[in-house]
A protein has these predicted regions:
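Cyclic nucleotide-binding regulatory module and flanking cytosolic helices
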Residues: 1-33, 77-78, 82-83
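Glycine- and acidic-residue-biased ligand/ion/polar-headgroup-sensing regions
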Residues: 34, 45-58, 73-75
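Cyclic-nucleotide recognition modules
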Residues: 68-125
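Short, cationic-aromatic polyanion-contact patches
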Residues: 167, 203-222
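Basic amphipathic alpha-helical segments that dock to polyanions
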Residues: 188-189
């Protein structure tokens, strides 16, 4: 376990001795596809790492639809925020495929942060990255389906490589669009030669062209508001 943790962020910033102490109190558990690891609102008691498989962090909307806020791939750590503020889990964690997840108690994680400032710094950076992802997802509600789906595919390709192993329904839940719109948009991408698709998999063939879809200019006549903030005299940042 210590050797495996040494390959992962943020644990590689710990000394071998600290990693070994952490490894001694970790627990592995296997979850079948669709099984819930924890639920939103449940008291947070651990930080989690995906050892094998894939975990989705999900919220259920008032209309019954599912919104996937984060996709956790093999080797990724999740739920650092509850470890920092000890507030309840903000989302359900569900095994998207058969998965093995490593559980690290909040107490052990806190102890490691207190003893290793570099580990704490990397943990905060990891949290900031996740916060940025959620912010970007929130901004997508103002974008057309084509741009949303292109952004989702490009983001997932950074985790999984050129072949993204998610179903149309899973992509729809991330992009915040319907299954039908997702399928229709992916078929259009396929006809344009941007992707190839098979059951449960989408391969990015021309990622640069997908990226270009994100740079589409705003429609003529649209308004942009700019707010200028002025600092008081004598103010110095930092």
């Amino acid at each position: 376990m210590e050797a495996w943790l040494a390959t992962l962020e943020p644990f590689k910033r710990l000394s071998p001795g600290e990693r070994q102490r952490l490894a001694l109190v970790t627990r592995e558990k296997r979850y079948a596809k669709g099984e819930t690891i924890f639920r939103a609102g449940q008291p947070s008691d651990a930080v989690w790492v995906v050892k094998t498989g894939r975990v989705h962090l999900m919220n259920y909307l008032a209309d019954g639809k599912v919104s996937t806020t984060c996709v956790m791939a093999q080797g990724e750590t999740f739920c650092c925020l509850p470890a920092l503020d000890r507030k309840p889990y903000p989302a359900d964690a569900v095994a998207a495929v058969d998965s093995t997840v490593v559980r690290i108690s909040i107490e052990a994680f806190h102890h490691a942060m207190n003893r290793a400032p570099a580990f704490m710094q990397d943990t905060l950076c990891l949290f900031c990255d996740r916060l940025r992802q959620i912010e970007q997802k929130g901004c997508m509600v103002y974008e057309p389906a084509e741009q949303r789906l292109a952004k989702v595919l490009l983001g997932l390709a950074k985790k999984f490589g050129s072949t993204v192993p998610l179903t149309h329904q899973e992509l729809a839940e991330i992009a915040g669009i319907t299954h039908e719109t997702t399928t229709r948009t992916l078929n259009r991408f396929k006809q344009q030669g941007l992707i190839r698709s098979a059951r449960g998999r989408t391969t990015l063939v021309r990622p640069k062209q997908l990226q270009a879809l994100l740079k589409v200019s705003k429609p003529s006549g649209s308004l942009t508001y700019v707010i200028e903030l002025r600092c008081p005299p004598g103010y110095r940042s930092g």
